[in-house]
């Protein structure tokens, strides 16, 4: 745990303790008696404040569970991905007057492109595969053929 996070946790615990101190004093103290009333010693009776202690215990357990879940979630999200596979991506550029250029790169999803090699004739592709390298046919001819 980092030093600032540890300081934050201890600060939160001390703040909760300071806020709960008046509640503890209220439960454990005797109520003052007035002159006209009969004074009852509350230490002799069973206190009816047991539900406050159970409620306080439940809140403490819930806070600890939430903290543990958040910590586990952070650790799970920050772990390195071992199952990420490297892929190869190829990009071809074809121009009217230029020959076909190929670029191959090894790509990892988490890191990005690792290795780039650019060679002009890396992938020899026959020219008839692409057809004539002229201007595209007009729209009317495409509509007639379909």
Curated annotation (Swiss-Prot):
Stretch forming the signal peptide: 1-29
Main location group: membrane
InterPro entries with a match to the protein in the record: TMEM207
Membrane topology: Single-pass type I membrane protein
Tissue specificity as recorded in UniProt: Expressed in some signet-ring cell carcinoma, especially those showing high invasion and metastatic activity (at protein level).
Keyword Membrane set for record: yes
Subcellular localization(s) per the UniProt record: Membrane
Residues passing through the membrane, by range: 52-72
Keyword annotations: Membrane, Signal, Transmembrane, Transmembrane helix
Cellular component GO terms held in the UniProt record: membrane
Assembly behavior: Interacts with WWOX.
Protein name as catalogued: Transmembrane protein 207
Organism annotation: Homo sapiens (Human)
Encoding gene (name): TMEM207
